[in-house]
Amino acid sequence: MSTPAVPQDLQLPPSQRAQSAFKEQRRQKLKEHLLRRKTLFAYKQENEVLSSRGQRVVTSEDQVQEGTKALKLKTKMADKENMKRPAESKNNTVVGKHCIPLKPSNELTNSTVVIDTHKPKDSNQTPHLLLTEDDPQSQHMTLSQAFHLKNNSKKKQMTTEKQKQDANMPKKPVLGSYRGQIVQSKINSFRKPLQVKDESSAATKKLSATIPKATKPQPVNTSNATVKSNRSSNMTATTKFVSTTSQNTQLVRPPIRSHHSNTQDTVKQGISRTSANVTIRKGPREKELLQSKTALSSVKTSSSQGIIRNKTLSRCIASEVVARPASLSNDKLTEKSEPVDQRRHTAGKASVDSRSAQPKETSEERKARLNEWKAGKGRVLKRPPNSVVTQHEPEGQNEKPVGSFWTTMAEEDEQRLFTEKVNNTFSECLNLINEGCPKGDILITLNDLIKNIPDAKKLVKYWICLALIEPITSPIENIIAIYEKAILAGAQPIEEMRHTIVDILTMKSQEKANLGENMEKSCASKEEVKEVSIEDTGVDVDPEKLEMESKHHRNLLFQDCEKEQDNKTKDPTHDVKTPNTETRTSCLIKYNVSTTPYLQSVKKKVQFDETNSAFKELKFLTPVRRSRRLQEKTSKLPDMLKDHYPCVSSLEQLTELGRETDAFVCRPNAALCRVYYEADTT
């Protein structure tokens, strides 16, 4: 096959083609052309995938027209390359050659395409034009080209999947936030001022931490790109980027030390300017974010030597950019970058001043702040803390006026005289009780004392006097009621009251026992006197006459008993005398007060018939016989074991049991009459 003839426009003069410099130049340009072609091939595949979803199909006529345009553009580029250049151009191309990797990755290839363009107009047109140039060749692919195409497509799929995963990754949480709210205590925990001992180590760590955060893309490639690229295109891109970075700098944490701010600002300025050319010209914002994330991952994996080299290069580039002659776009850049730097300085100074001026909070303030935070969250303590109680105690103490020594002494003297007076009155009452003074006089003195001094009820002696006033014949319930009232009033000391009540109860039991013994002795003495009188007379009496007389006497007693019962049914008020004298000494005849359901029904009938009834209660009154010995023992039993129906020894005690409006129905006791009848038969 014969090689195609070279057009005359592209041929060099024969005198220049033989030179070694031009041969080296052609070899270098051929390498650059092949590399550009490979990168544009991958870019074309990506554009084909995107255009297949909605773009139009390029016809054959359009391809021919675009091919002619590409040839014309190629001739123009060749003419420009043959023009004379300054000596520094070769060095720049060498640096670009070393910096650009041969891997066909999307990020670096796209960046090289954008960087190597010289005019803003051509930068938008070159990708489409060069892609159309390769279209006729793509129809006849060799095996190596097909292999490279497959590898590039696989790599593109991997990169797109990674980019999607990075986009789906959750965002980094805001520092100091807890459940959607920013907590001041969490911010203070990682922004407290460091101690003097750890200043050097902390400063080095923070410098190394802030530099990789700021350098998102690789600075070596972009720095060479800024030197090679045209000034007008670079300055327009950087002016756009400063407006975006000024918003992002507000989110970055302010510098911790003021003396590091100058160096950090210069480094950040250079890095932001160099990284602007890569990120802004890419196209949509989504690609910018993806490229910045991939660049961050590459920067984190780099070694410490690479970081130091990047720092030095960025500083040199920053100094060169500042030293360049000022143009219109450069003036705009400096005007926009200066307020950003001023904001950084002011934010850093304000943060340092606020930390230095902020005093160390006390434990009480911290607790109060914690309580406020808990109240805001809806967490309230069930029991109030002890600190609240301790704060109120001194206030109450301060409210009480502190009296002088003499006033307190006078108050103590008055209190002592007061207690002595009360004790004297109680002792006088006790003496009167022991002497046998009437109950009414002692009650008058006690009531007068309580009227004048109501607090005297809290003394036990008052209740002791009331218990001793009660006669020995009074029931035990009255004394127990006095004891209960003393407990309710809070009398002190209650032990003394308990001892006195025990003494009173023992006295009552002894009195009852003595009375029973005296009655038995008197009865026994009477019987002995009768026996002695019968023996002394010595008169012979017929036993038959004695039996007849005794029978006659018993019959009379039985008749009298029946008459008495009849009289009781007719008019119970006539029976005033107690039947104790008519019975023997070992037994007692008492009246039992009880009710029955039948009696209650009768009462309801009577009340229904007579609306204006004079009585309210209706009870039975039955004479019963009780043993004297058992009666004495049952009196000592508690109320639960005693007989529920009370027994009365006389009619006078009925007024104490019931009301005046109560009515009693007397019914005879056949058992008492039967006793007399049995005695008669024997």
Swiss-Prot record:
Residues 1-28, 152-174, 208-305, 326-402, 557-581 are annotated as: Disordered. The modification Phosphothreonine is found at T578, T581, T595, T596. Signal peptide: none annotated. Keywords: Apoptosis, Cell cycle, Cytoplasm, Cytoskeleton, Microtubule, Phosphoprotein. GO terms for biological process: apoptotic process; negative regulation of microtubule depolymerization. The keyword rRNA-binding does not apply. It is found in: Cytoplasm, Cytoskeleton. Pfam families: CKAP2_C. Its main location: cytoplasm. GO terms for cellular component: cytoplasm; microtubule. The modification Phosphotyrosine is found at Y598. The modification Phosphoserine is found at S177, S189, S533, S594, S601. Residues 332-344, 361-375, 560-577 have a biased composition (Basic and acidic residues). Possesses microtubule stabilizing properties. Involved in regulating aneuploidy, cell cycling, and cell death in a p53/TP53-dependent manner. Associates with alpha- and beta-tubulins. Belongs to the CKAP2 family. This is Cytoskeleton-associated protein 2. It comes from Pongo abelii (Sumatran orangutan). The lineage of its organism: Eukaryota, Metazoa, Chordata, Craniata, Vertebrata. The gene is CKAP2.
